[in-house]
Amino acid sequence: MLNKRTTEVYALGQHISMSAHKARRVIDQIRGRSYEETLMILELMPYRACYPIFKLVYSAAANASFNMGSNEVNLVISKAEVNEGTIVKRLKPRARGRSFAIQKPTCHITIVMKDISLDEYIDTDSITWSQKPKSKKKHTTMSYYDMYSNGGTWDKK
């Protein structure tokens, strides 16, 4: 029987204070590239959107090494998307006691990385047969501990 293995990890950045259009301009350059190539591109691009995306790519790679134990050399950005977030509304004071509405856009960025060295499916039949015990004991004795004497802390005065 084949079971599906998780080969993808993601990092999600929410409420990043920049326009989704400006973040998409950077995301389109790194989609489908390897981890090391992505870091080099993001360090050299002169846009303000590069720094939060750099942090998300680095976080997704840390998630992959912690959760799956994968190496950074094998990581590829499989999916990168930018969605519009909430609009933060502020008031700017103007002349003669008036105010002017300022809308500050936010965005949500999702980076999904895939480990290309791992297989997507695992053959569980070969694993379960090798891990089963060869003989079972029919009768097992259970030993109960005396739960009322726990080292004598309550017995002493």
Swiss-Prot record:
It comes from the Eukaryota. GO terms for biological process: translation. GO terms for cellular component: chloroplast; large ribosomal subunit. One of its GO terms (molecular function) is rRNA binding. Pfam families: Ribosomal_L22. Keywords: Chloroplast, Plastid, Ribonucleoprotein, Ribosomal protein, RNA-binding, rRNA-binding. CDD domains: Ribosomal_L22. It is found in: Plastid, Chloroplast. Its main location: plastid. InterPro entries: Ribosomal_uL22, Ribosomal_uL22_bac/chlpt-type, Ribosomal_uL22_bac/org-type, Ribosomal_uL22_CS, Ribosomal_uL22_sf. The keyword Metal-binding does not apply. The keyword Plastid applies. This protein binds specifically to 23S rRNA. Belongs to the universal ribosomal protein uL22 family. Part of the 50S ribosomal subunit. This is Large ribosomal subunit protein uL22c. It comes from Lactuca sativa (Garden lettuce). The lineage of its organism: Eukaryota, Viridiplantae, Streptophyta, Embryophyta, Tracheophyta. The gene is rpl22.
